[in-house]
């Protein structure tokens, strides 16, 4: 079973005069322990897909079709549940590291801090977990 399964995900933005189709029929499967990177040109929909996965699409955008399953949980059927998993089980780092990451800390330190916060682990255990993606 996939840890994260995105099936036929489409995201639209309803503008005044037209509909902008930001992502269309996206299909992704991620197994437990895997890390996914979305790569593409500016404006290709990477951030839109990432935001849709963790249910952070702002108006006038909306997920127009498809599903995002985190284990057995369809996060768009019960959006309140994603709050429990966002940052703990699934998260994203946006393409501009200056606004997404703390430039004073290493990426490793930031991962360790996040793991410690969500899983209540010691620094050593959090470091081991961040290195081995478990």
Predicted regions span which residues?
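ABC transporter nucleotide-binding domains
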Residues: 1-134
